[in-house]
């Protein structure tokens, strides 16, 4: 499995906050899904509240 860096923004009380998260995944699509899942479990956010701008290996 490869390590991907996912960057973007998410909605918070203070407006949009930038983020950079590193996830292990076999490809970019799975990395994107794991980032969404992490924000959902850690912050209680819906996928529509997270905007991913880049997925890089």
Swiss-Prot record:
It comes from the Archaea. Keywords: Ribonucleoprotein, Ribosomal protein, RNA-binding, rRNA-binding. One of its GO terms (molecular function) is large ribosomal subunit rRNA binding. It holds the Pfam family Ribosomal_L18A. Coiled coil: none annotated. Residues 1-10 have a biased composition (Polar residues). GO terms for cellular component: ribonucleoprotein complex; ribosome. The keyword rRNA-binding applies. InterPro entries: Ribosomal_eL20, Ribosomal_eL20_dom. Residues 1-21 are annotated as: Disordered. GO terms for biological process: translation. Part of the 50S ribosomal subunit. Binds 23S rRNA. NCBIfam families: PRK00773.1-1. Belongs to the eukaryotic ribosomal protein eL20 family. This is Large ribosomal subunit protein eL20. It comes from Halomicrobium mukohataei (strain ATCC 700874 / DSM 12286 / JCM 9738 / NCIMB 13541) (Haloarcula mukohataei). The lineage of its organism: Archaea, Methanobacteriati, Methanobacteriota, Stenosarchaea group, Halobacteria. The gene is rpl18a.
